[in-house]
Amino acid sequence: MKIATFDIETSALAANFGIVLCAVIKPWQGECQVYRLDQLPGARRSDDTKLVETVIAELNQYMILIAHNGVKFDRVFLNTRATKNGTALLNPRGNMIDPVILARKYLRMSYNGLDTIAQYLQTEHQKTPVLGHLWVQAVIDRDEAAMDEIVNHCIEDVYVLEEVANKLVPYVSKINEWGG
């Protein structure tokens, strides 16, 4: 069974105002695959069509996806962009394990963010901070160093996510489109 963790970084929280800057897909206990807007051909810098199409095509090869807040953000953001672009969707009924949903349901945490859960579970990898100005520099100024920091943050998130998911597996009773 093919399983992957993934994360996306976007220019805004709403897909009708933002674009996908990068995505990282990590086959379970495999190597990260990095997809960057600044390294894919596009008509304009604001055109994430090819990136979204490529990421969705790769994600659709997996039976189970793991994404923190993936049910309400990552999958929906990608599908909103794909709908606008007229490209294939990330299966909206595909099986997903969403640690934020598991944490809300089975853990009593002060906050269900990936960083809080990872700190509490003392995972080897921890989230890295990224300051807001880096997004502006990456998007507006086309600052490659800022984009590199955002991509590295996304890569680290996927490592943290895999560790958190591994520790929360005992709480997964049913894998479905609702996050577990």
Give the label of every model feature segment.
Residues 1-31:
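Entry/capping segment at the start of metal-dependent catalytic domains
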Residues 5, 64-69, 96, 126-129, ...:
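A structural signal for short, well-ordered beta-strand segments and their strand-loop junctions
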Residues 7-9, 74, 98, 157:
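Acidic active-site catalytic centers that drive phospho-/nucleotidyl reactions
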Residues 10, 38-43, 146-148:
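Surface-exposed cleft-lining segments at the edges of enzyme active sites
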Residues 17, 78-80, 166:
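Short amphipathic alpha-helical segments
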Residues 33-111, 115-116:
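Conserved DEDDh/DEDDy metal-dependent 3′-5′ exonuclease domain
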Residues 117-179:
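Acidic, Mg2+-coordinating catalytic module of metal-dependent nucleases/exonucleases
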